[in-house]
Structures are given as C-alpha cells and as structure tokens.
Swiss-Prot record:
GO biological process terms, semicolon-separated: assembly of large subunit precursor of preribosome
Keywords: Cytoplasm, Ribosome biogenesis, RNA-binding, rRNA-binding
GO molecular function, a single term: ribosome binding
Official protein name in the record: Dual-action ribosomal maturation protein DarP
Keyword Ligase part of the UniProt annotation: no
Pfam family, one: DarP
Classification via SUPFAM superfamilies: PSPTO4464-like (SSF158710)
Source taxonomy: Bacteria, Pseudomonadati, Pseudomonadota, Gammaproteobacteria, Lysobacterales
GO cellular component: cytosol
Gene giving rise to this polypeptide: darP
CDD domains to which the protein is assigned, alphabetical: YjgA-like
Function text: Member of a network of 50S ribosomal subunit biogenesis factors which assembles along the 30S-50S interface, preventing incorrect 23S rRNA structures from forming. Promotes peptidyl transferase center (PTC) maturation.
Endpoints of the signal sequence: none
Family that this chain belongs to: Belongs to the DarP family.
C-alpha cells in the first residue's frame, strides 16, 4: 500500500494509473538517500537545529559512527528507508531548514572574505582605502583604525606577534556585521 492508500494499478473507469510510477519512486528514493547523506555529515549541534523526528536520530548517530565503506553505505540505505516512511511534509521541512542553514553559512563566509579584503586593502593602500571605508561605514572610529593600521605595520616590520593585525580584523568584522544587519551590503572594489 502507498501512503495515499492506493495500490499501483489502473483505474478501470478512467484508465489512469494510481500512485507514482517506478521511475518516480526511484527518483524520490534517491533524493531521500542524498538527504540522509547530508544529515549524516552534520555535527550534533547542526542536527539539533533541524526538525528531525526523534525516531530518526539513533539511525543518524549510528550512521555517523560507522567508518567501513560498505557498512556505511548499507546503513545510509537503511536510514533513507526509515526516512521514506516519514511524512513528505517532515522531509520537506528538513530540506528547507538545511538549505536555509547552507545559505546562512554562505553569507557568513562572504562576510569573512569581505572583512579580509578590507584589512588587506587598508594595509596596502593606506589613507585612500581608509577614506573609502569611512565613507561606507560612517560609524567607524577613525582614530582607532589609524592606530591599529600603524601598529599592524610596525608588528609586520619587526616580525612580532600579529596582535594589532588580529584586532584590526575584529574591528572591521564588527563594522561589516553591523552594516549587514541593516541589510546594506557594501563590498570593496
């Protein structure tokens, strides 16, 4: 019996097939297998953020524990089978939440890259890049940034520990995150 209660077959009155075709069943099974692989690759903290039913968590944990290739493949197939027994809305909710967290991770990486680009530009170009930064981020503390730039250059020249270099990154990261929370994405050119 299928989830909708109909057996695969043909409606005698209309001639239409009941239930999904075998090809559709295979595609669905493959999609669920891919989803199970993604779930098995997540950390426990990431799994906790997803709307996963309690009865699937032991299977996911068991899959993560197995290291043997063939045994892991078999366990992934079993996990996918257990997931196919779940309601379609449950699987869709897991997919949506997983995609949303992936998008959030991409945004965080983009913010880190933007911060690194600004730090590099400030150290290479000096005052011209600082002026542009202050135009894009008017809330920035000009004196603090100048001091951190000076100290970073001094540290590099003397081969000292990059304390000001790291602090400059933290200050820039704070500026960019504050700006991003206001939904005004600016990137250096």
């Amino acid at each position: 019996m299928w989830k909708n209660g109909a057996m695969r077959g043909c409606n005698k009155e209309t001639g239409e097939f009941l239930g999904p075709s075998r090809s559709q069943q295979r595609r669905t099974a493959l999609e669920v297998l891919v989803l199970s692989e993604k779930l098995a690759a997540l950390t426990p903290a990431q799994l906790a953020k997803l709307p996963i039913p309690e009865r699937l968590l032991p299977h996911i944990t068991e899959t993560k524990r197995i290291t043997s290739h063939i045994a892991r493949k078999r366990q992934l197939a079993f996990l996918a089978k257990q997931m196919r027994r779940e309601d379609d809305t449950t699987l869709e909710a897991i997919r949506e939440k997983l995609n949303a967290s992936g998008i959030q991770a991409q945004r965080e990486v983009a913010t880190l890259h933007r911060t690194e680009q600004w730090r590099k530009r400030l150290l290479e170009e000096g005052d011209s890049a600082l002026t542009e930064l202050l135009n894009q981020y008017p809330q920035a503390d000009c004196g603090k940034l100048r001091q951190l730039l000076r100290n970073s250059k001094t540290e590099q020249a003397r081969n000292k520990a990059p304390q000001a270099f790291r602090e400059l990154y933290q200050v820039l990261h704070g500026l960019i995150i504050t700006q991003n929370s206001d939904n005004q994405h600016q990137t250096p050119q």
